[in-house]
Amino acid sequence: MNRIAFVAASAAALLVAGAASAQDTQSVAINASVAPKCGVSAQQTTVTLAADLTDADAKVRSGVTTEIANALNGARIVAFCNGVNNSVEIKRAVLARTGATGTSTTEGGFAQFIRYNLDATLGGVALDSTSTDGASTVASRFGGHISLSDSKTHVLFAQAASNGAPVASSNGSTPTATNWSSLTDRRLAAGAYTGSVEVIVTPGA
C-alpha cells in the first residue's frame, strides 16, 4: 500500500515537471545613446616654409599661400564631428615679422606682415574659410574613419577662393582678423616671420 502510494506520487511529480518545461520567453529592450562629439589633432604642431617668402625685389611671392597650405596638409590634421550642424572655424594669424611693433609699416616704409587666406575641406566636405569672420555651420557629419594614412580623414587646405593670394599687409585689428589691408606696392622687411592656423570644432545636434 505504501509502495503503491509512492509510485503514484512520483508519477504526479513527473507530470508537474513536464508541464514546467514548456518554453517561455521575455525580451528586454536596451536604450542607450551616443552624445555629439568633435575632436581635432595634428601629427605636427610646427611647420616651416623652406623658401624665402619674397622674390628678388623683396616683394611677397605669389606661391606663398599654396606653400603654407601644402605644409599644413603635411602636418596631417585629423578632425571629426559625429553629429550634424557642427560649428567649424579656421583661424589664421597673418605672418608677422618677429619683433614687429604695432601693425603698420616699419622704418623705410617696409611692410612687416603678410596676409593670406585658406579654404579648408575634409573628405570633400567644405568646412570653413579664413577669408570670412566667425565659424561656419557644417550640416553633415565628417571624419568617421580613423586613419592617419588616408588623406580623406585629414583637414585639407588650399588657397582661399576669396582674398587668398599672399600680399604685404598692415593695420589689421587682430592677427586673425579679415580686415588686414593689401599693400601691393610694398617690399617686406627682412627677418623671421611667424603665423599660425587654428582649427576649432564644436558639436552640433
Regions found by a protein language model. Name each.
Residues 1-8:
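Bacterial N-terminal signal peptides that target proteins for export
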